[in-house]
């Protein structure tokens, strides 16, 4: 092997002359050098994810870089082949950047056939022209060695095309090129560049074929390198209108680099994205989003689409899951269906109603004398004939279809001389039989009740003939007002459904004066009271009338909605319905103002969803709490208005209703967190003017906390004490925003406000408290020509990556960064550790004064925020532990999975 590889010839000859066309990015279809000439093709791509780049102090990888199709029990490795050629050849592979055109990468390949600068070579031929690389590893460069390695790689590359050496001008040019590469290079992504060399006439391998480039390989320790995976969803179907809230559990994602994509896999190519903000991503493992509307509102049957997680920057996607859109339910409350139904007859569902009518008519003459033409007053004559108190059981004594039996009994009692049918009454029982006597007594009582019922019905009909008032008939039949049809609707329900206002008032009047108040609150099979239906159908006058006669507004329907909740969902009619409900004087009004629905939303939250300042004013005037948090996430009305980006509502809540601009959700987010996460300069400016706290931190740590195992032996005894304190820095609005305009607003506001008191120092160390001289020296070091963009990496390590674009054009980016870090409550140890990991030992020396050295703890554990896009793996070799146990790691990190 050594005979065919000269380690002094690393790199690719005449690299600068190569024109990397888009075909190189798709290596499975390479362009040959000539129409029928030899060319290089990738047979097996490397695996894109799951492989870890390792530092030199960690030792070699356990197993080489696997192939894309590698599985347990069937290992594959990156493989290439020279086509249209047979004979001796040499194939080399090195690392290049993932951007186009590909440039030399600072990381290096390691393996049995690899040189010190990371170029691996194998010989192939003369028959088998396939090369398999089965022991490749990726050596992660340290920041302090990055420039040196880049210059060496570029020099070797240039020397292959210019063996006579480099001039001083060319060396300076290479150094400048290395500096430019360092600024833009992503240390978490590499690609393999395969190059083939055929044997020339002089016996050397100096005839190059066109290189081919592999697909990107992501460092498994990089925040954005993990495979996207949907673990669970609480809903797999929703309305075609969208807006359904879905809780999705997933593997680790980045708040600012993830989206939920809905799409159809057909010729239309429809796609849409779930609606959520960075604050809806919970600790990188759960996303709460609202479904987008389907592109067709009118569908006749359910439609199944797909959804997947997708990274915004890299475009990586997860496996797709199915989601079903169901047709729009226009008549959710089934009012229209019931209106289309034919009107019920008296025989349905009461049974025998027509016979009852005939019987009553036949008996009217017999009761004429008793009626005596007396007037009802208010149904006094009808009530006088009631044989049982209100609430007794006439329905039980009056079985359906029994009209004929009732009238027969009445004839026998009133006109015995006319020969009533004997089977209608029990036969005479023999003397001395108690059971027979008891049966006879019950039969007589039954007939007496039937007689009273018939008499009352007859009197009601007579009174109706005198007064022409339908309430006379209703009073006589008031016990039937509780009758329900197959949908559970009473006569009052049906009158409201069909909009019969006069009938509604008559029935309600009778119910009220007869003290049959239970009827007014009866529910149908959909758990709807008459008041619910009056609100659903928008009958404001009926709502007021029902409340006056005792309707209970606190009762809930099957969805958990009270009449007030339904009124707030009534669209344009909401203010009038709300007036009727709240101005009725009902004793339950204070109670319904503080009742949530089944989704945990209070009336003030529904008023925000209705986008109605008028409804908000009505609710607050009647005693609703504008600061009430909804039960799912603790959001106030101001939080919801901010999420909806309703500038008018936010202004109304802040200026007129004096909502608390610093109210917090269960996760500690203020409205300013939400506005910043949405990237809305207008809302941000409004909230800042209203006094929003720019320094407010939510409950999600900016940097993951150390595991309990790193806290020492005293962790158990100190645990309860630690639980009472907050020992980490959460995300501020500035940490959540990706908008340059919002960042500028927040930074300007931060400079114009006094610094907040620092949080209790975390276990990592004391707060950042340094003199101006030390900070100025560090600023000069980071902005100096030797640093070349180190401040940007420092920002990422300090969890302030969102500020990089903002500070890039400032006179002193590092100075602005350090001031923001200090303002945010950053600790000294975090800064020292970041500088040390970057190899900036001079900066560590500047900061480590006698007054701070003794304060530093022995443990140094720090991980990056989930908001970065590149790997921030600890890089300083000086922090590597001595070779105690095999596989020990640098910087106190827990043992990762090794590949």
Curated annotation (Swiss-Prot):
Q: Which residues carry this modification: Phosphothreonine?
A: 425
Positions of the ANK repeats?
Answer: 487-516, 526-555, 559-590, 599-628, 633-663, 667-696, 729-755
**Compositionally biased spans, kind Basic and acidic residues:** 410-425, 851-865
Give its localization.
Nucleus; Cytoplasm
Coiled-coil region: none
Naming one, the record's GO cellular component terms include: nucleus
Which residue ranges are recorded for the region named Disordered?
Answer: 403-434, 698-734, 851-899
Q: Which GO terms describe its biological process?
A: canonical NF-kappaB signal transduction; extracellular matrix organization; follicular dendritic cell differentiation; germinal center formation; lymph node development; non-canonical NF-kappaB signal transduction; response to cytokine; response to lipopolysaccharide
Q: Identify the tissues in which this protein is expressed.
A: Highly expressed in lymph nodes and thymus.
Q: Where is this cross-link: Glycyl lysine isopeptide (Lys-Gly) (interchain with G-Cter in ubiquitin)?
A: 855
The protein's organism comes out as Mus musculus
What is said about its interaction partners and assembly? Component of the NF-kappa-B RelB-p52 complex. Homodimer; component of the NF-kappa-B p52-p52 complex. Component of the NF-kappa-B p65-p52 complex. Component of the NF-kappa-B p52-c-Rel complex. NFKB2/p52 interacts with NFKBIE. Component of a complex consisting of the NF-kappa-B p50-p50 homodimer and BCL3. Directly interacts with MEN1.
User: Which residues in this protein are found as Phosphoserine?
Assistant: 23, 161, 713, 715, 717, 812, 865, 869
Say yes or no: keyword Ribonucleoprotein present: no
Described by its record, this protein's role is as follows: NF-kappa-B is a pleiotropic transcription factor present in almost all cell types and is the endpoint of a series of signal transduction events that are initiated by a vast array of stimuli related to many biological processes such as inflammation, immunity, differentiation, cell growth, tumorigenesis and apoptosis. NF-kappa-B is a homo- or heterodimeric complex formed by the Rel-like domain-containing proteins RELA/p65, RELB, NFKB1/p105, NFKB1/p50, REL and NFKB2/p52.
Q: Modified after translation how?
A: While translation occurs, the particular unfolded structure after the GRR repeat promotes the generation of p52 making it an acceptable substrate for the proteasome. This process is known as cotranslational processing. The processed form is active and the unprocessed form acts as an inhibitor (I kappa B-like), being able to form cytosolic complexes with NF-kappa B, trapping it in the cytoplasm. Complete folding of the region downstream of the GRR repeat precludes processing. Subsequent to MAP3K14-dependent serine phosphorylation, p100 polyubiquitination occurs then triggering its proteasome-dependent processing.
Task: Output this protein's name.
Answer: Nuclear factor NF-kappa-B p100 subunit
- GO MF: DNA-binding transcription activator activity, RNA polymerase II-specific; DNA-binding transcription factor activity; RNA polymerase II cis-regulatory region sequence-specific DNA binding
Could you tell me where the Low complexity compositional bias lies?
Answer: 887-899
So which residues are the signal peptide here? none
Where is the stretch described as GRR? 346-377
Q: What is the lineage of its organism?
A: Eukaryota, Metazoa, Chordata, Craniata, Vertebrata
Gene that codes for this?
Answer: Nfkb2
Its domain comment says: The C-terminus of p100 might be involved in cytoplasmic retention, inhibition of DNA-binding by p52 homodimers, and/or transcription activation.
What keyword terms does UniProt attach to this protein?
A: Activator, ANK repeat, Biological rhythms, Cytoplasm, DNA-binding, Isopeptide bond, Nucleus, Phosphoprotein, Repeat, Repressor, Transcription, Transcription regulation, Ubl conjugation
Instruction: Supply the SMART domains for this chain.
Output: ANK, DEATH, IPT
